[in-house]
Amino acid sequence: MSIPQLRKGRQLDIPVALITTVTVIGLILLLGIPVAKLIGIGVSERGLAAITQSFGANVDTLVNTLVLGLCVGIVGTFIGFVTAFAQVFLTFPGKKLLHWVTLLPTISPPFATATAIITLFGKRGIITYGIFGIENNIYGLVGLVIVLSLTFAPVAYLNIRGMMENFDNSLFEASATLGAQPLSTLVKVTIPMVVPAMLASFLVLFVEGIADLANPLVLGGDFRVLASQIYFAVAGSGDIASAAGIALVLLLPALTVFAVQKYWSNRKSVITVTGKPVGSLKEVTASSVKIPMLVPVYGWIVFVIVVYMTLFVGSFVKILGVDNTFTMEHFWYVQRLGSSAILTTLSMTLVAAPIAAVMALIIAWLVVRKFPKIGKILDFWGMLGIAIPGTVLGLGFALAYSNPTWLFGKQILPTLAGGLAVGGGAIAIILVYIARAIPTGQQACISALKQINPQVEEAARSLGASQVSTLVKVTLPLVRSGIVTAVTYGITKSMTMITAIIFITTPQTKVMTSQILDEVDAGRFGHAFAYCTLLIGLVLIILMIANLLVNRLNRSTRTVVK
């Protein structure tokens, strides 16, 4: 009887093997081939020669890039810490407003705020020149740090707040019992416990800062960074080898920082989780702590509101700060010339997001349930979609898929990127959307699977269900809220993405963010503001629908999970 059981077990493993194979092939297409092609050209004789010939300029650019990353990491992490601390430990007017204001930059295009910053603080800025009479040069390092910190501070806020909410209140009670003052408790207890989350946030913001392309193009001025150098090498001189070489220089620190961040993320539970009842955290009322925290918090709230009100108001006036006459001209322009870009962007994201969510679920299932020992490799591989700078990934796609893909002398894929590609290049853009959306969904599904008792799935298996049937009929319903979250994130991030697709957009496949960037380059800020307002409105509608759906799914599955 043992032989039939063995055969049956092998038969049951065949679908798992097929799923694993298809998933690995998908990751190879999404990440392996583009990165391999980029590395191949970057380390070629032409690529290395291009780097050597411009070594001095590249060193200066590398230093600029690292300085920018450090500044964004420090400022963004500080904003994340004070806003998270205020949200968790303080009671003050506008507390709910702080949460939503802090999350607002996550649903807008990355360079939308740069346009508003120029309008407010440029040489003829509404605030700098209109109020104070100062001709301020906002272009360069300072402007980039302001905009990028505003854009990515929500990442630090969510990360640090999540750790603070898991603090054990007994630690603060013990500190007070020993006679420590509130400020001393903040410095000697709170900050040391939140260091892992702060370091992880700093590293994430560092990578985002050095990888961003759109803001340096709009606000960089003479301050060159590696991402913009890659763009100018391709768009300006058509020097693909030089661009690939510079991309490798950008890729190395990004992957190194990602590996360190992954290590610290895995360690943070050691400090916060004690295994004892946590209880509610005690409110901090001491003015020695409250005032220093609330001053930057209220400054942050006012700053973000002013920036986004500039976007909104600017879309309804002729020229904000010059001719404030009410007009709908900018929206008529978008409706007349940009409606196709809106529909194309929305349709591509609606295709990419579900595929990314399914792949994220499968990767998480393989990592947690099927291959826990070697799952870290697959987990790391799937996370490369966000670890690799968008500029580097987009260039890799342009290099890899601008021509047919061949294997052993046979064509296995047609041209996917470029104006002559299948679908006008839309397939390559969708693939980039998928690659960039997988990591967040993957982490959400891994967390959800770890919270589900494996005996639930084992019970289905004992009743004769196959592994695939168990995945579809048991596991999927239990993690569907995570799937909805993954789909929502995929849609919102894809709709606001530009850095990773700037090299593969085509006239046949217009994307909203690319259209906005064109309007900014042409100095038509009103049109850009109108695009941004519509884009933010679309994303908000999607988020509200997803929030209602997640709440309903959580209510329907809570009893089953218990």
What kind of region is each of these model predictions?
Residues 9-16, 49, 53-56, 139, ...:
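Interhelical loop and adjacent transmembrane-helix boundary motif
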